[in-house]
């Protein structure tokens, strides 16, 4: 894990501070500021007033830029993303150095890899790990599907057996071979049951 302030975030702040210093240096140049008020600064009080305005403007501009920079960093979560990038690159370097020495000798030296290549090494490893997890989950899903298919097949067999048994009962007790007069209500009920089974299955 990297420190709370990663190297890339520190460098970004250094770049910002240099840009801010260059911008402020123009405001801090008395020659440039006084040239905007050539007659006014000729008097002592006028020069004092312009100097005070210059100081206040410099402080205001510095505070404004720093506040906006901080808000942008927080809004876009830049520090965390840069720290995560540091971690990815560090992890990629560690993974690369831990590889078999023979494979390392065949490839380029770690110092010769760019940040992009190191990140790609890490992403490749992450993708392979994700593919392995997906394969395992897919195997479990296929196993569940096979179990469900077998249960469905068993259920269909059971339903077919019950249909045959009902058909035999119908033929035995209510078919043309019986000598006893059939109960009309019972016959109708069984007929409805058989029709319902045939429609549903």
UniProtKB/Swiss-Prot annotation:
A Pfam family matched in the record: Nnf1
Keyword match Cell division: yes
Alphabetically ordered keywords of this record: Cell cycle, Cell division, Centromere, Chromosome, Kinetochore, Mitosis, Nucleus
Subcellular location: Nucleus; Chromosome, Centromere, Kinetochore
Gene Ontology cellular component terms for the protein in this record: kinetochore; MIS12/MIND type complex; nucleus; outer kinetochore; spindle pole
Any GO BP annotation: attachment of spindle microtubules to kinetochore
Note: Present with 2070 molecules/cell in log phase SD medium.
Reported function: Acts as an essential component of the kinetochore MIND complex, which is required for the spindle checkpoint and kinetochore integrity. MIND plays a role in establishing a bipolar spindle-kinetochore interaction by joining kinetochore subunits contacting DNA to those contacting microtubules. NNF1 is required for a number of nuclear functions. Cells depleted of NNF11 or containing a temperature-sensitive NNF1 mutation have elongated microtubules and become bi- and multinucleate. They also have a fragmented nucleolus and accumulate poly(A)+ RNA inside the nucleus.
Subunit-structure text: Component of the MIND kinetochore complex, which is composed of at least MTW1, NNF1, NSL1 and DSN1.
Annotated protein name in UniProt: Kinetochore-associated protein NNF1
């Amino acid at each position: 894990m990297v420190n709370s302030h990663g190297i890339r975030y520190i460098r970004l702040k250094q770049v910002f501070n240099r840009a801010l210093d260059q911008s402020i240096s123009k405001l801090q140049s008395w020659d440039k500021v006084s040239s905007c008020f050539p007659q006014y600064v000729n008097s002592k009080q006028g020069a004092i007033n312009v100097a005070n305005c210059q100081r206040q403007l410099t402080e205001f501009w510095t505070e404004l830029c720093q506040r906006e920079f901080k808000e942008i960093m927080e809004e876009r979560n830049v520090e965390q993303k840069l720290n995560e990038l540091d971690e990815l690159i560090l992890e990629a370097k560690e993974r690369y150095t831990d590889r078999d020495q023979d494979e390392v000798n065949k490839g380029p030296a770690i110092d010769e890899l760019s940040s992009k290549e190191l990140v790609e090494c890490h992403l490749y490893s992450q993708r392979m790990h994700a593919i392995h997890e997906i394969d395992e989950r897919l195997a479990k899903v296929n196993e569940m599907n096979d179990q469900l298919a077998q249960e469905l097949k068993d259920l269909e067999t059971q339903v077919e057996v019950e249909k045959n048994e009902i058909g035999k009962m119908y033929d035995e007790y209510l078919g043309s071979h019986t000598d006893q007069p059939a109960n009309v209500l019972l016959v109708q009920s069984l007929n409805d049951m058989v029709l319902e089974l045939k429609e549903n299955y």
